[in-house]
């Protein structure tokens, strides 16, 4: 009887060890991720990637749209599944916003509508091709002092701006900065069938001399990220944050 108990114990331990070994190997090397992200940044500042044509007439609107469709077709052929579309550029945007003016990249005239909604169009075309569209939001830099974005912010929220070198930036230490950026991200999430919000330049300017501790600086940036996260998730919990 003791021999049988001993044999059963050995078999049991061997089974556990084998299972643990298989689990250890297979957990990381053989089980593929549910969905691999293959993403590209689609840059709109200065029309770097798109648009190449300014939209201000029916003909140029269609040409601008076709440029994007051609790009998305190429990305689809390259097996991309996620497009990070630069949506907030430098205190300016590529959709009709209650907070910030139009960027000049779409119409050729800063502050002016191109005659259609580029963000809505991009989302629809991405989804037609089975690709996600994430709004790429440049967070802290807002461009040169005489730019459309800084002028708008100077008029509405001068307390949120600081000048470093030749550029203007939002003040990360201000709670109102976190709220302002969160409002933009909430607006996008509420109004569009967006798949994600992608925060860029979510940091202090590289050339800025901090007069606070690095720990406090990290906390200030974390406050912005958390405020944006909470605002987005309150609207649509499934929208991704990156």
Tell me the role of every PLM-derived stretch.
Residues 1-22:
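Bacterial Sec-dependent N-terminal signal peptides
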Residues 35-37, 43-66, 124, 134-191:
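Active-site-adjacent "subsite" loops/lids of carbohydrate-active enzymes
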Residues 57-78, 105-129, 219-223:
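Aromatic- and glycine-enriched glycan-recognition loops and surfaces
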Residues 66-92, 191-194:
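Catalytic domains of carbohydrate-active enzymes, especially glycoside hydrolases
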Residues 78-114:
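Aromatic-lined carbohydrate-binding/catalytic grooves of carbohydrate-active enzymes
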Residues 93-108, 141-165, 202, 207-216:
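Aromatic- and acidic-residue-enriched segments that line the glycan-binding/catalytic groove
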Residues 183-186, 190-242:
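Active-site neighborhood of glycoside hydrolase catalytic domains
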